[in-house]
């Protein structure tokens, strides 16, 4: 029978059994080696209040502590929440991490928003308005 993945979707090589974990999203029981694990590092204080907290701090140069959280998802929750994405048969074998997208700056206008110049007329442009 053909197989989809070289590892069978698990990281259990030559172990008979691994203990289950609970999904952080839905609570489903999932083997620890099959679960999709992500380590989230965030600031304890939200971005808008960091400067206020640092100015109110007694200590000079005090670095705010971070919040470390390990989330473990079952396969269905990871796909549903776009933690991992479905890949084509050839791309499943690619082991390099996907490119990280940078956020668009807030001051650049999005296409089709007010304040943007109209599109130039071209071969695919709409016909002249009827009178």
From Swiss-Prot:
Q: Which domain of life is it from?
A: Eukaryota
Q: Where do Basic residues bias regions lie?
A: 86-95
* Extent of Low complexity compositional bias: 113-131
The entry's keywords: Ribonucleoprotein, Ribosomal protein
Which residue windows are coiled coil?
none
An example GO biological process term is: translation
* GO molecular function per UniProt: mRNA binding; structural constituent of ribosome
The record's annotation in Pfam families points to: Ribosomal_S26e
GO CC annotation terms, alphabetical: cytosolic small ribosomal subunit
Region (Disordered), start-end ranges: 86-131
Segment forming the signal sequence: none
What does the sequence similarity comment in the record state about its family?
Belongs to the eukaryotic ribosomal protein eS26 family.
Q: What is this protein called?
A: Small ribosomal subunit protein eS26y
Species this protein is from? Arabidopsis thaliana (Mouse-ear cress)
